[in-house]
Amino acid sequence: MKSQETLFEIAPAADWNEAYPLGNGRIGAMIFDGTADDVVALSEDTLWAGRPDSEYPVVLKDTLPMLRRLLREGRYTEASDRFWKICGEKPGPGFRDSAVFVTAGNLHIIADDPAARGYTRMLDLRRAVDTCSYTGTCGKVSSTAFCSYPDAVFVKRIRSARARNYRLGFDSPVKGSVSATGNEFFFDGVCPAWARKTETATYETADGLTGIAFRVAVRAIAPGAAVAAADDQLVIDGARDLLLLVAIRSNFKDCDTNPEDSGIDFRALCRADLDAAEARGFDAMLKAHTKDVGALYDRSRLILDAPVSEEGVPTGRLIEGSPGKRFAPTTLIALLYNFGRYLMIASSRPGTRATNLQGIWNNMLTPPWGSNYTLNINAEMNYWPAQTTNLAECLEPFESQIRVFAKQGAVAAEKIYGLPGWCLHHNSDIWGFAGPASGCPWWAYWPVGGGWVCRKIMEHYRFSGDNAYLKQWFPILRGAAEFLSALLVEDDEGKLMTSPSTSPEHGFIDPETGEDCTCCEGSLMDLSIIRELFETCLEAAGILRVGIAGDPLLATLAEQLPRLRKPVIKADGCLSEFGNELPDKDPHHRHVSHLYGVYPAAEFTSLRNPDLFRAAWRSLNVRGDLSTGWAMGWRVILRARFLEGDRAERILHHLLTLVSSGPGGHRGGGVYRNMFDAHPPFQIDGNFGATAAIAEMLLQSHETTDDGRTLVRLFPALPKNWKGGRITGLRARGGLTIDIRWGSDGTRTVTIKADRDGRFHFITPWGERSADLKAGGRLVLRPA
């Protein structure tokens, strides 16, 4: 059904959260499709504040023993207060903190005939093309826009029945200047040398050095029309066919190189991009673009049976009607899945930067939370759908960023802790900042981030079976494990734990003082991440035939692994988030960090440890289903792991609540009219989390049987309300590609293709079956 792969409205975007996103992994464009002032909000993935910097003023190696002693004595309030003073120093240009992602600015396409009748605008996800049409005083007006990965430019073409006049302008909150000449105009900007979250930006360091410089170059091509520069604008008279090409380049090279020393002539690169695009022409670029996107998008699509009444309804209106229904319209469920994959293709391509809190889209100088890499859930959640929904190539930017993290993290580990290996904390940026941020320790101090990001490495191997890849990445795995191994301390019983320890952005109540506290001994998330990393490192070493005898660290990991403190089940039957019977500060907190072992990891499963799995389920029940947008995405996928399809769907229903962009209306978690996830504000991780969750409701492959087979669950959490549908191209660990089809009449067909030899056990609603598949083999499962 077309509505399940299309965003559609009958009015221009009223604000940024109604605009449609286009992207080629590097350039992001938000399309308003206005009639009088048609705004295109532009961004580019290297436009960050800051400069290379390996200074870490917070040094903890001499402070940790004192904090550990206080925690050992149960003096949680005193330990938390002292730690806050250490981490809570207000940052400034001399204080190293994560940098912010910066907008490029807004292209304005101003027409002289704003009147419009019969207005429609549409984002075709399969083609990654925005189209708009209406009738004005000059007759029928239509436009087509896309961001081309093959041609490295943003393209917009506007055609009208009769000639129109236009003015093209540009504005930006970033420091810079606009100039125009011939049929081109340019915005030459410079990112702040320092800026943090929503605070004031500083454009020069104390030494007079500046941030990343960039150019936005716009070329207007209008056959038969007059195009002229007028001050800082282009004026176009008498155009029936206007083609706009936009290139954006910067002088960012890598995390070590000062921008001014990069040797990158970004202005010349812009000109080369525009020249090549103009020479190729609109039709050829559109054809190359749709072929490029289709090769990725068409691998996996979800189509659900839906009433005809949902077809052709504007997306915003469909969302508006959702709260009054018991279940979210199945059209929206399928659209949510397909849109998440679309966003990944648009925001993360080989050779580009990893997606941040807002993907690659931003209209602010200092956006919320800096639109940075938030590593205690959000950055990792961005890539949850990559493997399961068949977009493994889109992981490459995040993998490249892991190398940056590891490089800078080695400096941080030595300077801050005096320890080997590499570390990573809560916030980072394009420069790879790896130290604690300033602020409350329950988010500023979290040294296990390296362990979480490294799970992408082993997951890639489990899906691909690529030994060369694993060998290439093993030193990164080893370095993360080396740091966390050295960070561990013994408790009174000789068990190993982290201390001080936090559980991201959550705290507990000190039983003695009644005060809110931030740090404990051995939070469950810390130990789940460390346990998984040690197991992964040892497993990888075995696959690569790296002997323990030849690597003392591996011997240490093997000795430490069984000594890690085990999860604690509290008297109420829930998992202890903070290591023992410490009461939660907020039982309904948005983070569910103590359930890391359920998802994304596979530490707590019904096969491996049913008691802990049951305690995790009780813990999720206490936390509750309603939360911020991204947090509901995590809850959906947890419910899928607990095989609760109907409850997972109910959370998706709440996730599809329309959030108002302006004053009034719903302000909790949900989606905006353009389907962007609302924390609020917009955070893209909720979109990716929801897409991964929908895939997990239909296919799971994270478990292994006692005899070593990959356990594949089919329809593990299918809601009763999804009467029929089909999904293609899902990926399972072990190298399987799976198509699933089901009908309201009870028919089921599962088609399985194997990339490589493997041993599997399949669990379906109609029975179980083991199978040994050869590379290129095919298996079809259906009820007898």
Task: State where each predicted segment sits.
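Aromatic-residue-lined binding/catalytic grooves and analogous aromatic/hydrophobic interfacial grooves
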Residues: 1-442, 457-461, 478-481, 495-496, ...
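Short, small-residue-rich loop/turn micro-motifs
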Residues: 428, 449-451, 455-457, 500-502, ...
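Acidic/histidine-rich catalytic neighborhood
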Residues: 479, 483-540
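Inter-repeat boundary and helix-capping residues of tandem alpha-helical solenoids
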Residues: 329, 447-450, 625, 684
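Charged/polar positions within long, soluble alpha-helices
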Residues: 298, 345, 486-489, 539, ...
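Non-membrane alpha-helical structural segments and their capping/turn regions in soluble enzymes
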Residues: 283, 330, 334, 451, ...
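Non-catalytic carbohydrate-binding regions of carbohydrate-active enzymes
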Residues: 459-460, 464, 468-469, 480-490, ...
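Well-ordered alpha-helical segments within folded domains of soluble proteins
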Residues: 377-387, 447-458, 525-535, 593-602, ...
